Curated annotation (Swiss-Prot):
UniProt organism field: Hyphomonas neptunium (strain ATCC 15444)
Pathway info: Amino-acid biosynthesis; L-proline biosynthesis; L-glutamate 5-semialdehyde from L-glutamate: step 2/2
Cited Gene3D superfamilies: Aldehyde Dehydrogenase, Chain A, domain 1 (3.40.605.10), Aldehyde Dehydrogenase, Chain A, domain 2 (3.40.309.10)
Record-level GO BP terms: L-proline biosynthetic process
Protein name: Gamma-glutamyl phosphate reductase
PANTHER family: DELTA-1-PYRROLINE-5-CARBOXYLATE SYNTHASE (PTHR11063:SF8), GLUTAMATE SEMIALDEHYDE DEHYDROGENASE (PTHR11063)
GO molecular function: glutamate-5-semialdehyde dehydrogenase activity; NADP binding
Length: 428
């Protein structure tokens, strides 16, 4: 598979429709496979990625050179970059997905109503999933293998910045499927960087797509949600918060905040706003600020924060709404737990928020009242990751309320049907 630039519109439309038809056919073939067949395919993919490492890393080096020439931000470059360690992590993640319990055929519930029917709710695939994402080549693999594990066919459309890396990875995955005599079109990558391809996917490819999963910045996700004619599992943005409560353990507070912000600043689980209780701000905030600035983090604060820390950049309303994906942190001093909850009610994206406290009652109040997909107590927001949840990988973090919420793994890429068994009943 090679990267194309801009085929004529009519040709692109037919190419996309053909991909949809082939994906639909592959999804039917997947329905005939056993769990062991899919596991065999996943293990073959892990081996193929390792074998293709020189080609993948060479392609990634070309993508990185082009991205630097275009002046991509450091956070975007970090997301795009692959090295031997990261690529081995990708392959190991595939093996973890292969070892997961099969999500299909699970009996979710079973009951017998007064009419005597035996009714079971059974997990089944969604069908054909379109995944639209930006400059993260690992998503090519994560999305492809999670769809395979859950019996879904995948049409992948990555960002132009990662086009060569994604093509090399897709070639490895498809080659593995072919070698195992499994449906190769279960994983397809849109080979063109022409943005019209996204529009075709949003139209549903004449009924071929059952759901679309966007993974990227706000503009991408908002476009998908506004224009898609098929259901969307949306991942809007991170904009995560960490609240240091009055009863926080000081060492935990310093360690967790430093990790939540600086472990990897370019991931969606990075804390972008620190809320600190007024009761401990004067004593604890300077310790946290020193750890952050020593690590190279720029701080921005409200008036009470600046009164404690001195000469730092004033935080504006725009800062409270900004996912920096960089070594920048906004800080607000809040009036206890009610003040933290009020700030989150206004500014949280619904992705991931955390409280640091030794007060169990306060933690439970926070968990119950913060309306986010992931709410943590005494842990870094950087645990907002499907791999850390034991899902092996994730296709994204869903911030909506319909179908899936939080890390979207193989289990979340299923729906259900009802198997109803009778003994000759007719309805009166």
């Amino acid at each position: 598979m090679t990267v194309q630039t801009s085929p004529p519109s009519a040709a692109l439309a037919e190419t996309m429709l053909d991909m949809g038809r082939r994906a639909r056919a592959a999804s039917r073939e997947l329905g005939l496979l056993t769990a062991q067949d899919r596991t065999r395919g996943l293990k073959a993919i892990a081996a193929a990625i390792r074998a293709a490492a020189p080609d993948v890393l060479r392609a990634n080096a070309e993508d990185m050179a082009a991205a630097r020439a275009k002046g991509l931000a450091p956070a975007m470059l970090d997301r795009l970059a692959l090295d031997e360690k990261r690529l081995e992590g990708v392959a190991a993640g595939v093996e973890t997905v292969a070892a997961l319990p099969d999500p299909l055929g699970r009996e979710l519930a079973r009951w017998t109503p007064p009419n005597g029917l035996d009714i079971a709710r059974i997990a089944v695939p969604l069908g054909v999933i379109g995944i639209i994402y930006e400059s993260r080549p690992n998503v090519t693999v994560d999305a492809g293998v999670l769809c395979l594990r859950s019996g879904n066919a995948a049409i992948l459309r990555g960002g132009s910045e990662s086009a060569k890396s994604s093509a090399a990875l897709a070639n490895a995955m498809r080659g593995a499927l072919k070698s195992e005599e499994l449906p190769v079109d279960a994983i397809q990558l849109v080979a063109t960087t022409n943005r019209e391809a996204v529009g075709h996917m949003l139209g549903g490819l004449e009924g071929a797509l059952d759901v679309i999963v966007p993974r990227g910045g706000r503009s991408l996700v908002e476009r998908v949600q506004a224009e898609a004619r098929v259901p969307v599992i949306g991942h809007l943005e991170g904009l995560c918060h960490t609240y240091v409560h009055a009863a926080a353990d000081p060492k935990k507070a310093v360690d967790i905040v430093l990790n939540a912000k600086m472990r990897r600043t370019g991931v969606c689980g990075s804390t972008e706003t620190l809320l600190i209780d007024v009761a401990v701000a004067a004593t604890l905030l300077p310790q946290i600020a020193k750890a952050l600035t020593d690590a190279g983090c720029e701080l921005r604060g409200d008036g009470r924060t600046r009164a404690i820390l001195g000469d730092i950049t004033p935080a504006t309303e725009a800062d409270w709404a900004t996912e920096y994906l960089d070594a920048i942190l906004s800080i607000a001093v809040v009036d206890g737990l009610p003040g933290a909850l009020a700030h989150l009610a206004r500014w949280s994206s619904g992705h991931t928020d955390a409280i640091i406290t030794e007060d169990t009652a306060a933690a439970e109040t926070f968990i119950a009242n913060v309306d986010s997909a992931i709410v943590l107590h005494n842990a870094s927001t950087q645990f907002a990751d499907g791999g850390e949840f034991g899902f092996g990988a994730e296709i994204g973090i869903a911030t909506g309320r319909i179908h899936a919420r939080g890390p979207v793994g193989a289990e979340q890429l299923t729906t259900y049907k009802y198997a109803v068994r009778g003994t000759g009943q007719v309805r009166p």
